[in-house]
Amino acid sequence: MAQGWAGFSEEELRRLKQTKDPFEPQRRLPGKKSRQQLQRERALQEQSQKFGLQDGSTSLPPEQLLSAPKQRFNTQRPYSSPPTPLTLTSPVGDGKPQGTESQQKELGLKNSHEVHKNAEVLPLKADCQLEKKKVELQEKSRWEVLQQEQRLMEEKNKRKKALLAKAIAERSKRTQAETMKLKRIQKELQALDDMVSADIGILRNRIDQASLDYSYARKRFDRAEAEYVTAKLELQRKTELKEQLTEHLCTIIQQNELRKAKKLEELMQQLDVHADEETLELKVEVERLLCEQEAEARKQVVHLERSFQPSGESVTLELAKENKKPQDQAASPKVDEQGKNSNSIALLDPERPNQEVETAVKDISASLIT
């Protein structure tokens, strides 16, 4: 109804002016709408058609709609003339009632008032409806834009939340896997450390024990080495002393034999006894035997020295030393006694020089062997 109405025509306005009540104050009629208002109304109508509005109805719930402003209509009644009696008697004496004319005038005035009121109320209602539609369309367009933006934001937020939840789940799984891997590696390293620490402890204990044994053995070796050196020096001295004594013995025997030979020659010259070849050969043989026995005695002495050398232990060295001392002490008086006996025998019995020499050599060799 509001879409087809475009305002009053000029004839209607003229007729309304003519039928206007003179007693009612003049009201300002709405003028023609400008081009901008018409374009705005058309845009609002197109927008309402686009959003599916029909006859001002909206798709929003009633609690979301804005309340329309209440229009105040001017319902003042025109000043009416005081009531007059319906029947008036004219002063003229014809006696006809004059109330019909006044009634007709009142009816005409009432009709004109009603027409004027209807003409004023119609454009006011149309303007109110247009304003309501404009406000509703504006509110609806804003509300729908806000709703669309809100929906888009909600969808974006949902997607972001889903992505965040997915990323958090992946990160949590990854961190759990990494923590499990790190724990496993830590356990393996701890096991290796425990094994290595146990092995190291055992080896350290063994090394300590071995170092103690080594120090004890080193001390023993140092003592044995010192004893060996001292024993070797002592042996060298004893060996030199023995060699000197044997050489002295040999020289004594040789000189004794020379004295015996000279003595025998003197005796033979005094007795005028000539030595034959047999005696000379016997003398040569005796000298050879003496030399051989002397060489054998020396060899035996060397062999005994080698047999009495230390084998690395101090006990054997001490025993050898203890055994050598009485032997040397016993051998030296025996040799002296044998030399003395041989000299005395040779002097007493000069006829048996060979037997005395042989016995002396045998005694000396026996003493050296023992």
Curated annotation (Swiss-Prot):
Which segments does the entry list as coiled coil?
Answer: 142-284
Q: Which ranges does the record mark as transmembrane?
A: none
Q: Which family does it belong to?
A: Belongs to the GORAB family.
Matching InterPro entries: GORAB
Q: What UniProt keywords apply to this chain's record, in alphabetical order? A: Coiled coil, Cytoplasm, Golgi apparatus
- A GO CC annotation given for this chain: Golgi apparatus
Region annotation Necessary for interaction with RCHY1: where it falls in the sequence:
185-370
Q: How does it assemble?
A: Interacts with RCHY1, RAB6A/RAB6 and SCYL1.
4Fe-4S among the record's keywords?
no
Q: What is the lineage of its organism?
A: Eukaryota, Metazoa, Chordata, Craniata, Vertebrata
| Designated name of the protein | RAB6-interacting golgin
GO-annotated biological processes = non-motile cilium assembly
In residue numbers, the region (Disordered) covers 1-106, 320-370
Composition bias, Basic and acidic residues:
11-27, 349-361
Signal peptide segment: none
Q: Where in the cell is it found?
A: Cytoplasm; Golgi apparatus
| Organism of provenance | Bos taurus
